[in-house]
């Protein structure tokens, strides 16, 4: 069967069926491949019969049953002698499909152009599809966006583009952190405006969010890179590493201040220089505190990652030692005292800065709350001012109330008279304008209907033209490719090879027939020999029984021998019967095994499962149809 399946698969591929390369037998055919193979064969055998059939199996169950019934009717019209129905294709069995495909392969025309050597395989099909798709896309004309239909319109201009203008945003961080004050958490929960409310222009929201996310990601990446390169080598925790860096920076600042103090002392500047240094340190600390939050990423990186080269620092110290004069012990003590006092001042200033920072945070929250209250009061004041202006105007009119009432009544009468005139004019114009509007609307509706009808006709015609052009190009390319492949192939090679293979199959069949005939003749000879031996045994027993029975009445040992002879004959008969029953049972076992194998090839369980799934799908489709009917 393997050779038969290979020949069938080659014939199906020559008819245009896309059989995968890994499929080597009919047993591996699925429902979709079976339907495609049968439809392709029908199209080659009888184009008018197979033109109305689709080679693609639809997803709906009703459509599948219709296609299965149509295929069965087409096969019966061709003269298929076996049983065929929709179940043959939807719930197939290997023997039935093999017999049907053999019948269709025999019906194929032997000298038809469709029977030429057509290239098969996924790679060739994929290349043809890619080439056809590219040519089809290149052949389409370019259309501006205003001339396209709504489904294909794309913005190809810059009318909707905006400048990338990012602004700072105030966003809440993780509220579970213990280092965040409760006042700030309350502000985030109750008073922090949304992102869209923080910016004056909506187009800046996306740019601001992207910039904020980019800055956070880059800061995190810089910290990760620094921690991997330097932090891990220090064997410290991240908090300790940051505190150590902060201490190093403070020491460096103190060293710079000390050097500045020494230079001031050498230049004999007034004693107020120490106070100036203190003010400078205070300003530096204040700026540093604000820069820790508001500095750019570059300044933060420079502040936390910058480290002076030790060799450069050593050279600077040596040059400073050469330039500065030698100091005596008294100057050294004075400098030490001054440094200690400066250190105390630095500590006190840092303490004050921390206190001021906390006060600043609380004041910021208070300011935000006060600003909200001020806004509410401002709105209330504006409303009251409007009321006061109205009342003030009324009070100004009170001294001359009679004349003012007469004037007001005259204004009201004039306004009423003018309103009546306007209403009359509007009514006179309304009728004419309404008629014109209805007429224009009717004309516009007719024009829209006519335009939609013309557009639909033009679209259908364009689709037909494009489909016909694509089909013509595809057939022309296929013809050229098949012609080139046909010319490159050697003539009569495949037919001679298949003829040789068929002759080999015929010779194998003859050998099998000879072996079967030999087995049958041997079986007949064995049966004949068994019958002869059985008859000989029966005759021998009858003669022996007669001879022994004559002497059994007179002699006791002969009587026992007669009994043993009868028992031996009975046991031999039972043994022969047991052997025959064993052979019958073995033959029945072989028959049952063949039946089991036959049923297994029919894929009964899988077909039953498919039937159950199709039944469920049909029930679901019926339920959907009933629901649609009820809705209608």
From Swiss-Prot:
GO cellular component terms listed in the entry, alphabetical order: centrosome; endosome
Main localization of the protein described in the UniProt heading: other
InterPro entries in the record: CCDC22, CCDC22_CC, CCDC22_N
Cellular localization per UniProt: Endosome; Cytoplasm, Cytoskeleton, Microtubule organizing center, Centrosome
One of the protein's GO biological processes: protein transport
Keywords: Cytoplasm, Cytoskeleton, Endosome, Protein transport, Transport, Ubl conjugation pathway
Family statement: Belongs to the CCDC22 family.
Record's function text: May be involved in regulation of NF-kappa-B signaling. May be involved in copper-dependent atp7a trafficking between the trans-Golgi network and vesicles in the cell periphery.
Name this protein carries in UniProt: Coiled-coil domain-containing protein 22
Organism: Xenopus tropicalis (Western clawed frog)
């Amino acid at each position: 069967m393997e050779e038969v399946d290979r020949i069938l698969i080659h014939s199906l591929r020559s008819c245009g069926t896309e059989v995968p390369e890994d499929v080597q037998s009919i047993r591996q055919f699925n429902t979709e491949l079976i339907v495609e193979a049968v439809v392709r064969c029908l199209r080659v055998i009888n184009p008018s019969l197979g033109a109305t059939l689709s080679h693609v199996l639809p997803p709906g169950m009703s459509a599948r049953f219709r296609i299965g019934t149509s295929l069965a009717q087409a096969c019966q019209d061709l003269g298929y002698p076996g049983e065929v129905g929709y179940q043959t294709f939807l719930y197939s069995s290997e023997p039935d499909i093999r017999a049907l495909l053999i019948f269709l392969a025999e019906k194929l025309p032997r000298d038809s152009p469709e029977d030429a050597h057509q290239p098969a395989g996924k790679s060739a099909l994929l290349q043809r599809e890619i080439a056809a798709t590219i040519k089809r896309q290149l052949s389409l004309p370019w259309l501006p966006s205003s001339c396209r239909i709504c489904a294909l319109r794309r913005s190809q201009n810059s009318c909707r583009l905006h400048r990338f203008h990012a602004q700072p945003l105030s966003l809440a961080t993780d509220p579970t952190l213990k280092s965040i004050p409760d006042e700030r958490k309350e502000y985030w929960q109750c008073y922090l405006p949304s992102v869209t409310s923080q910016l004056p222009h909506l187009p800046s929201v996306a740019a601001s969010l992207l910039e904020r996310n980019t800055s956070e990601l880059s800061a995190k990446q810089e910290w990760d890179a620094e921690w991997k390169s330097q932090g891990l080598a220090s064997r410290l925790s991240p908090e300790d590493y940051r505190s150590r860096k902060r201490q190093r920076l403070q020491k460096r600042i103190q060293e710079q201040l000390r050097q500045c103090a020494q230079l001031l002392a050498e230049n004999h500047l007034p004693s107020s220089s120490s106070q100036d240094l203190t003010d400078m340190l205070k300003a530096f600390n204040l700026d540093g505190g604000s820069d820790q939050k508001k500095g750019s990423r570059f300044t933060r990186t420079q502040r936390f990652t910058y480290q002076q080269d030790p060799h450069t620092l050593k050279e600077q110290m040596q040059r400073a030692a050469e330039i500065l004069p030698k100091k005596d012990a008294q100057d050294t003590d004075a400098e030490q005292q001054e440094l200690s006092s400066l250190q105390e001042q630095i500590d006190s200033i840092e303490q004050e800065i921390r206190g001021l920072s906390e006060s600043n945070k609380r004041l910021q929250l208070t300011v935000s709350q006060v600003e909200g209250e001020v806004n509410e009061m401002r709105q209330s004041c504006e409303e009251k001012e409007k009321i006061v202006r109205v009342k003030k105007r009324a009070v100004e009119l009170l001294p001359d109330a009679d004349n003012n009432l007469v004037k007001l009544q005259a204004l009201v009468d004039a306004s009423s008279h003018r309103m009546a005139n306007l209403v009359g004019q509007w009514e006179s114009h309304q009728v004419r304008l309404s008629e014109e509007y209805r007429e224009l609307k009717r004309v516009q509706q007719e024009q829209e209907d006519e335009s939609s009808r013309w557009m639909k006709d033009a679209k259908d015609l364009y689709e037909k033209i494009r489909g016909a052009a694509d089909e013509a190009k595809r057939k022309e390319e296929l013809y050229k490719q098949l012609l080139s492949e046909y010319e490159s192939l050697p003539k009569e090679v495949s037919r001679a090879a298949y003829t040789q293979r068929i002759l080999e199959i015929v010779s194998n069949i003859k050998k099998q027939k000879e072996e079967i005939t030999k087995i049958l003749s041997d079986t007949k000879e064995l049966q004949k020999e068994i019958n002869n031996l059985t008859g000989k045994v029966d005759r021998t027993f009858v003669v022996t029984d007669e001879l022994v029975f004559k002497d059994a009445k007179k002699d006791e040992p002969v009587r026992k021998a007669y009994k043993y002879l009868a028992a031996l004959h009975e046991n031999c008969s039972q043994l022969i019967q047991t052997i025959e029953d064993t052979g019958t049972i073995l033959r029945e076992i072989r028959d049952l095994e063949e039946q089991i194998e036959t049923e297994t090839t029919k894929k009964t369980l899988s077909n039953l499962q498919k039937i159950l799934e199709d039944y469920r799908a049909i029930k679901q489709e019926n339920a959907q149809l009933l629901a649609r009917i009820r809705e209608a």
